[in-house]
Amino acid sequence: MAKKKPVEKNGLVYKEFQKQVSNLKKAGLIPKTLDVRKVKPTKHYKGLVSKYKDVATGGAKLAAIPNPAVIETLEARGESIIKKGGKAYLKARQQINQRGQIVNPFTVRVTKRGEVVRRYRKTTPEGKPVYITQRELPIKFENMEQWLTELKAAGFQLQPGEQIYFTFNGNYSRRTYTSFDEAFNKFMTYDIIIDAVAGKLKVEDEADLVKSVGFQRISGPEAKAYNRNRIVLPEMQFSQAAKKKYKRRQKRGYGSKGV
């Protein structure tokens, strides 16, 4: 029996168009009361699908931001924010895996404090599922001591079968620790961090120094065997401007004391 051809209206495959509108509805960009089955490919809806193409096609996920006060902090961290109808949404960042493939979060949400929680589903070489949860903290760099205190207070409670490590990334180095206290103490041995706490860095340097900080946990029955050395928490990424500053310091005989 021959398959039915998809119904086309205004040059669009109608069913595919409805699916794209449905994705916008799930993301909160159009009213929840809308009956997608009755939507016609009008100029209005075609415009919305075109404007939010990556969301409509399922290539990007949105999360509602429940507290408008954290929008400025999220934008300063380089997050992509969509504002529509008096509401704000965070567009989830994509990851590139080792094969060069784009990986979208399994789920993404924003807490009232402004924490961004992303959950990814990956598999072991044997095909077993592993879940990776990333939680980025909305901590401004202006108060470094508070930043470090909140970072330490926001640690995860381990659940049965979970594996957790702490890694510091920055200044062209990466070190992984099994104890948060050990990682925290090593974190504080860097000259550039000590200068920040002591207020020796200029405001523009502070803004460039740290992009984000967060925790990452791996859970699932295969968590322990998944990858022992790639769980990173806290993760601190230095901007290009900060890296250049650090290189100049090294040439003058300064640098990090620890690593």
From Swiss-Prot:
Q: Which GO terms describe its molecular function?
A: DNA binding; nucleotide binding
Gene Ontology BP terms: DNA replication; viral DNA genome packaging; viral DNA genome replication
Localisation per UniProt entry: Virion; Host nucleus
Which residues get modified to O-(5'-phospho-DNA)-tyrosine?
A: 190
User: Motif Nuclear localization signal: which residue numbers?
Assistant: 243-259
Show the GO cellular component annotation of the record. host cell nucleus; virion component
Keywords attached to this entry: Covalent protein-DNA linkage, DNA replication, DNA-binding, Early protein, Host nucleus, Nucleotide-binding, Phosphoprotein, Viral DNA replication, Virion
What role does it play?
Acts as a primer for viral genomic replication. DNA terminal protein is covalently linked to the 5'-ends of both strands of the genome through a phosphodiester bond between the beta-hydroxyl group of a tyrosine residue and the 5'-phosphate of the terminal deoxyadenylate. This protein is essential for DNA replication and is involved in the priming of DNA elongation.
Family indicated by similarity: Belongs to the tectivirus DNA terminal protein family.
- Cite the record's note on assembly: Heterodimer with viral polymerase. Binds to ssDNA.
Name assigned to this protein: DNA terminal protein
Q: Which organism is it from?
A: Enterobacteria phage PRD1
Its lineage opens with: Viruses, Varidnaviria, Bamfordvirae, Preplasmiviricota, Tectiliviricetes
Name the gene: VIII
